[in-house]
């Protein structure tokens, strides 16, 4: 069953008197439980497409159905509810609040969801333990390595039990060992919890952890690659 379906979407911007087409008629369908990558050179439309999938932006034309809802027809508040309740975001930069502990950073989405008291703390702690950070819950970001900070960011993304995780260059700021660790976590979340994952990456090794690769060029899908195995194993 499709979690999301995009049909012939475009995204156009005005830069002064010039109209820029970031996406030019993109169509794709992603099933529940799939792990897919979006690859392409700079300026190919990868981040624009991810922003639309994540309800951070809307297409100029075309349709986008997520969880049975026509996203392009929703109001800002309805889009915010979908982002908060159904989508987890992981970025290249960790975006952790520096004056909050790992636990407090992970609790933030639950505050917005109206989860209070002991339940909020227990869920945040469980999310951190699931990525191997049970002994770092009271550490501040500056007391952790880059890989550990990205694991906190992943915990924050999954603590609300989303159906979809969107990752934009999630290993871009990490060394090779930390990158491998992060990708193994994503793969486990996909395999064991059935979370759908869509990631943007420039790195072939990272894309190999998924099941399918959408190759973008000049705002269009150039071809779709189906992978036989995951993680290069």
Predicted segments with their positions:
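H-loop (His-switch) and adjacent beta-strand-loop-beta switch element
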Residues: 213-225
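ABC family nucleotide-binding domain
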Residues: 3-216
């Amino acid at each position: 069953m499709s979690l999301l379906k995009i049909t012939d979407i475009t995204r156009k911007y005005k830069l002064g008197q010039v109209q820029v087409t970031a996406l030019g008629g993109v169509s794709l369908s992603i099933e529940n439980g799939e792990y897919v990558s979006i690859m392409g050179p700079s300026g190919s439309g990868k981040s624009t497409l991810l922003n639309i999938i994540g309800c951070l932006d809307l297409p100029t034309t075309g349709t986008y159905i997520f969880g049975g809802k026509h996203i392009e027809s929703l109001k800002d508040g309805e889009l915010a509810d979908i982002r908060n309740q159904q989508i987890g975001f992981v970025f290249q930069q960790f975006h952790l609040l520096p004056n909050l502990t790992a636990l407090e950073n992970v609790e933030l989405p639950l505050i917005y969801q109206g989860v209070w008291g002991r339940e909020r703390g227990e869920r945040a702690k469980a999310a951190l333990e699931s990525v191997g950070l049970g002994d770092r819950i009271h550490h501040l970001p500056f007391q952790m390595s880059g890989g550990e900070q990205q694991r906190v960011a992943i915990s924050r993304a999954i603590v609300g039990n989303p159906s979809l995780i969107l990752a934009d260059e999630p290993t871009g700021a990490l060394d090779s060992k930390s990158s491998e660790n992060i990708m193994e976590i994503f793969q486990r979340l996909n395999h064991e919890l059935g979370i759908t994952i869509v990631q943007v990456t420039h790195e072939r090794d990272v894309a190999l952890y998924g099941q399918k690769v959408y190759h973008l060029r000049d705002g269009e899908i150039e071809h779709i690659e189906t992978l036989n195995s995951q993680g290069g194993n």
